[in-house]
Amino acid sequence: MELSYQTLKFTHQAREACEMRTEARRKNLLILISHYLTQEGYIDTANALEQETKLGLRRFEVCDNIDLETILMEYESYYFVKFQKYPKIVKKSSDTAENNLPQRSRGKTRRMMNDSCQNLPKINQQRPRSKTTAGKTGDTKSLNKEHPNQEVVDNTRLESANFGLHISRIRKDSGEENAHPRRGQIIDFQGLLTDAIKGATSELALNTFDHNPDPSERLLKPLSAFIGMNSEMRELAAVVSRDIYLHNPNIKWNDIIGLDAAKQLVKEAVVYPIRYPQLFTGILSPWKGLLLYGPPGTGKTLLAKAVATECKTTFFNISASTIVSKWRGDSEKLVRVLFELARYHAPSTIFLDELESVMSQRGTASGGEHEGSLRMKTELLVQMDGLARSEDLVFVLAASNLPWELDCAMLRRLEKRILVDLPSREARQAMIYHWLPPVSKSRALELHTELEYSVLSQETEGYSGSDIKLVCREAAMRPVRKIFDALENHQSESSDLPRIQLDIVTTADFLDVLTHTKPSAKNLAQRYSDWQREFESV
């Protein structure tokens, strides 16, 4: 099949609209069930459902004239009109209690088939029959004579299946009756597909909870459906599930100044494989591991927050305290459960911050490394090898301030290693302008600045992004300190205080702050550059 830009774009849009519709349907079902349980008095069951879904079902309420019983009654009426009998909803189970668990994979397949292949209404053919079908028509008439009741039932079903759709043939002139049929008019399938996708997306936006859904409203798969694990493993899975990031950091790609190479590689590994899976097959399979290294405060964690905001994946924010346990054997079990959960909730992203605290070099400790630490590192390496050999959409994003302390085996599994260096002059100028614009309002306060941004960008060479933010905060804080002095020194209660007027922040004030605020990692810049020349992979 030949690929084109149009095909890829429309395929992605159609798949995204279908996923949105499926997600909204699942949420609506859970809210309907919770509402029905509450109305019928099953309060404990409703509370257990809300606790397991972690969706906050009580924040939503069912619309007027909508409930689960009404929907079931309408389905029964529709089924009776179509098939002249009521549907059989449940049946008595013949299996034992141990085999009563639902077959999730088969049910999921059936739901997918129903979603993708919806039944179309039957249309009565009113075209003139061809000569080749004359014999078949005669046979049908003879059969109808033998079974007249069957013909009535079939006609009734056809009429009830039309759903108000009437089809009539186009009348032709008498001179054109014997002429060859003309080709039909050209149908703009591209326009039809675009309109259908736009209509489905807008309808979902109106019927769902929000136009920009919050990650906290994302419906996660229940741990009870985590097949293949015993009770101990499920307890560990509950521990790891607490680190699934469900809050919206509200960090967009455009909020990150610079880091263009890092943002592009993250999109190649996380965003594009989900949008355009046709392009990422074979040798073009997406990256499974990405290491961001550089001085502190340059935006490594900020980039991970952008991934949690922009990418529609399950985000695991993992630190050393998550996978390190004092109990023997629990650390490697936690690592295994982490990757199993990531596959279960795929597509997902595992963010390992301060990686050197977990994966330092083996065999370099003078007194010998602890056995439990070695087992945990080995399990982490084995699990990452499993990711590289599988087609699961699981991506490992790691950040480190000390890349020279990482184990060589871990570096091999992190396919892309990007230096997040100190910001350039243009980036520093943009940061200063962002934090100290000419006029900035913060509720009741209005701060004015008169800064030469080009001069300040030269003077802040060697400062990281967090250092520049700290300098800007200190420069803005100096006029505010004068307000504190006026408020504290005012003794007379009869006289009113004057209107608050902040002094203008000038270039001299900013330069004075620079003399008292030094960069945090200027001396390590050369060491990062040397390590980059030896281990870079972009």
UniProtKB/Swiss-Prot annotation:
It comes from the Eukaryota. Signal peptide: none annotated. It catalyses: n ATP + n H2O + a microtubule = n ADP + n phosphate + (n+1) alpha/beta tubulin heterodimers. Residues 138-147 have a biased composition (Basic and acidic residues). One of its GO terms (cellular component) is spindle. GO terms for biological process: cytoplasmic microtubule organization; microtubule severing. Its EC number is 5.6.1.1. It holds the Pfam family AAA. It is an enzyme of class 5 (isomerase). Residues 94-147 are annotated as: Disordered. InterPro entries: AAA+_ATPase (IPR003593), AAA_lid_3 (IPR041569), ATPase_AAA_core (IPR003959), Katanin_p60_AL2 (IPR027497), LisH (IPR006594), MT-severing_AAA_ATPase (IPR050304), P-loop_NTPase (IPR027417). PANTHER family: AAA DOMAIN-CONTAINING (PTHR23074), KATANIN P60 ATPASE-CONTAINING SUBUNIT A-LIKE 2 (PTHR23074:SF78). Severs microtubules in vitro in an ATP-dependent manner. This activity may promote rapid reorganization of cellular microtubule arrays. HAMAP family: Katanin_p60_AL2 (MF_03025). This is Katanin p60 ATPase-containing subunit A-like 2. It comes from Homo sapiens (Human). The gene is KATNAL2.
